[in-house]
């Protein structure tokens, strides 16, 4: 990847380069890339994780992105507590849990994970219909009730319960950062469905896009029947998703 980036800097001077890596690795990669360059530095490369990418995209279009919400995280938590109180009579298994102050934060985090995997109230209902375990059925249906009511209440306040990654996806086409950009994605071992949406959008908008996947050999030569047990099962999943 570093070699290709150096080549782009030579062949296309001044054109923006985005190197997307896991958030904890950004500073290490910046240092390694700087040391790799002949001049021991670079000016046109943005080494970012998903969070920093979002910040720079919003900054480029004069938007605060996720921070534009008039409701803080605490405000959303309070709103969720209000929703659960209103729906208490419809809840059986979760009724006692709703009385605990910390449960709204737990539920908020759960809804955040649902959004990352593109799971909504209707998906929870379908999941409840497909399982045979009665307790799991009830839990899924009660979660669907809470999530649906929460989304409706947010809508009444002019808010959306949207995944932060999907906000970046919506903002990217407006960003001048993508003009004649070269995008490189490196160091990831798995992605959520919303991450894939962002990757596809980056690939559509970029002049050039490259993603690296750590695999021991050509994917087609691996034992397909035992892929799930393979040490590289997650990178293989990325490969299968991207080439599908």
Predicted regions and their residues:
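Conserved RecA-like ASCE P-loop NTPase motor core of nucleic-acid helicases/translocases
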Residues: 14-26, 211
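Short, surface-exposed basic-aromatic patches at helix termini and helix-loop junctions that form
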Residues: 10, 34-40, 200-205
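Conserved helicase NTPase motor core
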Residues: 73, 123-242
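Short regulatory helix/loop adjacent to the ATP-binding pocket of P-loop NTPases
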Residues: 32-36, 222-225
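Conserved SF1/SF2 helicase motif Ia
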Residues: 5-17
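Basic/charged alpha-beta structural segments of nucleotide/phosphate-handling enzymes
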Residues: 1, 24-28, 34-177
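Short glycine-/polar-rich loops that comprise or flank the Walker A/P-loop
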Residues: 13-16, 40-45, 179-180, 206-209
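Short catalytic/ligand-binding loop motif for oxyanion handling, primarily in non-cytosolic enzymes
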Residues: 26-29, 54-56, 192-193, 218-221
């Amino acid at each position: 990847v570093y070699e290709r980036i150096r080549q782009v800097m030579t062949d296309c001077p001044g054109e923006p380069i985005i190197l997307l890596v896991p958030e904890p690795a950004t500073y290490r990669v910046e240092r390694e890339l700087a040391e790799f360059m002949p001049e021991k530095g670079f000016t046109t490369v943005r080494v970012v994780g998903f969070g920093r990418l979002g910040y720079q995209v919003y900054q480029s279009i004069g938007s605060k992105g996720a921070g534009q919400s008039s409701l803080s995280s605490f405000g959303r938590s309070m709103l969720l507590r209000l929703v659960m109180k209103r729906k208490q009579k419809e809840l059986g298994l979760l009724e006692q849990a709703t009385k605990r102050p910390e449960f709204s934060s737990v539920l908020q985090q759960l809804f955040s994970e649902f959004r990352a995997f593109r799971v909504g109230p209707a998906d929870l209902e379908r999941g409840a219909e497909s399982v045979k375990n009665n307790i799991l059925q009830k839990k899924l249906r009660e979660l669907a009730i809470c999530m649906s009511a929460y989304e409706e209440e947010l809508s009444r306040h002019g808010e959306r319960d949207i995944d932060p990654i999907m906000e970046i996806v919506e903002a990217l086409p407006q960003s001048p950062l993508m003009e004649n950009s070269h995008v490189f994605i490196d160091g990831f071992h798995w992605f959520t469905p919303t991450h894939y949406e962002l990757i596809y959008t980056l690939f559509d908008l970029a002049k050039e896009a490259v993603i690296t996947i750590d695999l021991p050999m050509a994917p087609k030569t691996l034992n397909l029947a035992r892929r799930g047990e393979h040490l590289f099962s997650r990178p293989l999943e990325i490969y299968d998703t991207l080439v599908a």
